[in-house]
């Protein structure tokens, strides 16, 4: 990638598969497949609530009586709605329509997004300057040392949103480093928004740079903004049909079973009061001791990113002076703002899963700074990330 974000995109072909690429792709497929099989064996097969909602959608309504009394459900005059985004439901529709693989759909859907996201980590690393074996190390970190693996194998519609967003943001960043077609960039951000609305904030810095660098600025802005506008309108309609307001996502009025989450929500769904606890979960939360085997356990609300994915620290190697690095840092920071203002934190998780909203930008920074690697320290951090 050219260090100047305003420079014209390169027409030079970047991605040519070689033996190492194929072996990496095969390794990802095997690891993710085996991990999913273990998850299925350990958790057994259950019908996901998102699959139930998909069946209701095919019947012409958004509510489902079976949702009553479950977490993140909204009761509107005796009709029960699941307070999740549209892209957490839509992939279930084919399974609901054909009535096949009930209970397995959630695992297969997560893999369908998670595996390609892991595969694309390699071209992402190369697009932002990683060369030779270093690109494979970075790709291995993304595939096995980030929370992408965790979110891809447990068959959970909450985690699915992160896989969807991670994949589309990865494609977005690769496209930005290459041809920078406004319609493609806008489409990727639009899809990411439908999965994780927080990620739409990345459109601000990238959109400004795109418009600034183009002679056809108005046309570029329209091509970038149209798919984003359609996605926002669709999400608003989706909320209005369920809750009577395009701005009501349901999380402010949904049913909660955990008193601590209810107490946090009382402070505001988005509030500065949430920042200290979210920072603690994201950066400082440590394993807790047990008096018996395995002697350590983790807080179900989160675990420090510095323990789970310490290789993200190498994003600092990119520095802050390079204009490309500045753009990526700004995007990551903007996306992180609502993450740390939000009350939820992400219950029943390993690590701090909301960090996946801005992780793709940090991965690009890791690759951008890879020319400054010493060697073993960075590989050690990646090894710890994978092992954790």
Locate each region found by the language model.
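Membrane-proximal envelope and lipid/glycan-remodeling enzymes
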Residues: 1-388
């Amino acid at each position: 990638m050219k260090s100047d974000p305003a420079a014209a995109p390169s027409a030079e072909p970047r991605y040519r598969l070689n033996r190492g690429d194929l072996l990496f792709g095969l390794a990802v497929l095997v690891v993710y497949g085996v991990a999913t099989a273990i998850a299925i064996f350990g958790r057994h097969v259950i019908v996901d609530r998102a699959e139930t909602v998909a069946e209701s959608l095919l019947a012409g309504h958004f509510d489902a009586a079976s949702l009553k009394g479950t977490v993140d459900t909204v009761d509107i005059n005796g009709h029960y709605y699941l307070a999740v985004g549209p892209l957490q439901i839509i992939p279930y529709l084919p399974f609901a329509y054909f009535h096949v693989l009930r209970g397995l759909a959630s695992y297969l859907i997560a893999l369908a997004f998670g595996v390609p996201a892991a595969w694309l980590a390699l071209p992402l690393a190369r697009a932002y300057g990683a060369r030779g074996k270093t690109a494979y190390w970075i790709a291995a970190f993304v595939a096995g040392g980030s929370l992408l693996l965790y979110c891809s194998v447990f068959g959970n519609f909450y985690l699915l949103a992160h896989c969807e967003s991670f994949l589309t943001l990865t494609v977005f960043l690769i496209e930005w480093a290459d041809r920078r077609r406004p319609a493609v960039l806008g489409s990727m951000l639009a899809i990411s928004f439908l999965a994780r609305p927080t990620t739409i904030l990345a459109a601000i810095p990238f959109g400004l740079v795109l418009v600034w660098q183009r002679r056809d600025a108005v046309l570029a802005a329209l091509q970038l903004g149209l798919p984003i506008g359609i996605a926002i309108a669709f999400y608003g309609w989706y909320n209005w049909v369920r809750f009577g307001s395009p701005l009501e996502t349901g999380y402010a009025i949904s049913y909660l079973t955990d008193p601590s989450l209810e107490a946090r929500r009382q402070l505001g769904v988005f509030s500065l009061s949430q920042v200290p606890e979210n920072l603690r979960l994201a950066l400082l939360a440590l394993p807790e001791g047990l008096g018996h085997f395995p002697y350590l356990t983790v807080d179900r609300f989160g675990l420090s990113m510095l323990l789970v994915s310490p290789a993200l620290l190498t994003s600092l190697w990119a520095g802050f002076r390079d204009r490309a690095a500045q753009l990526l840092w700004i995007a990551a920071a903007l996306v992180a703002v609502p993450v740390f203002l939000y009350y939820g934190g992400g219950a029943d998780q390993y690590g701090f899963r909301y960090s996946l909203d801005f992780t793709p930008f940090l991965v690009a920074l890791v690759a951008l700074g890879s020319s400054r690697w010493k060697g073993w320290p960075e590989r050690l951090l990646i090894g710890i990330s994978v092992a954790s």
